Regions:
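Catalytic glycan-binding domains that act on GlcNAc-containing polysaccharides
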Residues: 1-149
Length: 149
């Protein structure tokens, strides 16, 4: 999977391997599908750990510090957002909170993006499409591994 992501987003494979590993740990910690976390990263930052938006969202999961200060304080403050592990863990924590609060993945994703009132759910559809591609890559990789065994 890391190879696929690295090629598609033109990021070094060893860097992506680290992101994938962190996403799996975050998924386990927050009971989230790691592919959903990876899909959010793809849509939010294209796997750029130093991405910053015009509204101040930062890092892989594009977290806006002013909305989550308590989560960031636990990791040393908002400057920690440029550390991939912190960014992914905090992003996963936020996503988990929204899933609990709203009860479904589509709404949680729309809220994560600040687009709850967007009628076509364009953001969540992008994330779901990316997740489907990652799932296909995972199936392909497993099938390849099984064939070579």
């Amino acid at each position: 999977m890391a190879e696929y992501i690295a090629r598609r987003y033109r990021v070094a494979e060893d860097v992506v391997t680290n992101f994938v590993s962190i996403a799996y740990r975050a998924g386990e910690k927050y009971s989230l599908d790691p592919l959903l976390i990876l899909a959010v990263m793809a849509v939010e930052s294209r796997y750029n750990p130093v991405a910053e938006s015009l509204v101040g969202a930062r890092g892989l999961m594009q977290i806006i510090p002013k909305y989550h200060p308590e989560k960031l304080d636990a990791h040393g403050g908002e400057q920690a957002l440029l550390q991939p592990e912190v960014n992914i863990l905090v992003g996963a924590q936020i996503l988990r909170e929204y899933l609990r609060r709203f009860g479904d993945t589509e709404t949680a994703l729309q809220v994560y993006n600040g687009a709850l009132d967007e009628p076509t759910a364009k953001y969540s559809n992008k994330v779901f499409a990316e997740k489907a591609l990652l799932e296909a890559m995972r199936v392909k990789a497993r099938s390849k591994t099984a064939q070579s065994a």
